[in-house]
Amino acid sequence: MIFRRQLSTLIPPKVASPATLHGAPNAKRMADVVSFYKALPQGAAPALPKTANPFKLYYRKYFHPKSGKASGAPLLHLILGIFLFGYISDYQFHLKHHKNGAH
């Protein structure tokens, strides 16, 4: 009798009983995750549509993740744009200065 009780502790309980399989909350959550990933589209992403918008073209050329061209060109364009804006505004203010007969 004592020997039989010692052996019963070595035998694992029924882990895969029907009551434990249907009642596990983790099984439901895992099924939700699997169904979510099954609903996602498969394969490569579709190609971007053609556009004539210069801002979209600039974005696709320099900033889009699939372009693969990391460079300092946008920073250089920003510096040149600020310089050009400053030069044009300075020139216009200088012309207004000559309009009043100064110099």
From Swiss-Prot:
Disulphide-bridged cysteine pairs: none
Subcellular location: Mitochondrion inner membrane
InterPro entries linked to this entry: ATP_synth_F0_fsu_mt_fun (IPR019727)
Transit peptide: 1-6
Domain of life: Eukaryota
UniProt keyword Transport, yes or no: yes
Keyword Ion transport: yes
GO terms under biological process: proton motive force-driven ATP synthesis
Recorded family membership: Belongs to the ATPase F chain family.
Function in brief: Mitochondrial membrane ATP synthase (F(1)F(0) ATP synthase or Complex V) produces ATP from ADP in the presence of a proton gradient across the membrane which is generated by electron transport complexes of the respiratory chain. F-type ATP synthases consist of two structural domains, F(1) - containing the extramembraneous catalytic core, and F(0) - containing the membrane proton channel, linked together by a central stalk and a peripheral stalk.
The name this protein goes by in its record: ATP synthase subunit f, mitochondrial
Gene assigned in the entry: ATP17
